[in-house]
Amino acid sequence: MLNYLWFFLAALFEIAGCFAFWMWLRQGKSALWVIPALISLTLFALLLTRVEATYAGRAYAAYGGIYIIASIGWLAVVERIRPLGSDWIGVALCVIGATVILFGPRFSAS
């Protein structure tokens, strides 16, 4: 269950870091936005390594579903944009895929 905490914290810091770059490069804000961006993205990478997984690629793929949930949450809470029905359908499809990756059977590759 601790994996979910790491996934959600990683998503928060990844989105915050990318949003800070967005504010600088797309919204014309000060280059000082790069400082919290780099700190946030570093924390994102460190937190994602805390996930208990044998293979990095599988951890990243499962994380993708959490990232998408968090991104739609960010859209609603931080940017104050109401998600569309198509957003929620996309979230559901991605979460189903991430769940299959996260909880699917593991067979030997030999």
From Swiss-Prot:
Membrane topology designation: Multi-pass membrane protein
Q: Which domain of life is it from?
A: Bacteria
Which keywords does UniProt give here?
Cell inner membrane, Cell membrane, Membrane, Transmembrane, Transmembrane helix
InterPro entries found in the cross-reference section: UPF0060
Its subcellular locations are:
Cell inner membrane
Locate the transmembrane regions by residue number: 5-25, 28-48, 59-79, 84-104
What is the predominant subcellular site recorded for this chain?
membrane
GO cellular component labels: plasma membrane
Family label? Belongs to the UPF0060 family.
UniProt-listed PANTHER family:
UPF0060 MEMBRANE PROTEIN YNFA
The family database entries (HAMAP family) matched by this protein are listed as: UPF0060
Protein name from the UniProt record: UPF0060 membrane protein Pfl01_4105
Question: What organism does the record attribute this protein to?
Answer: Pseudomonas fluorescens (strain Pf0-1)
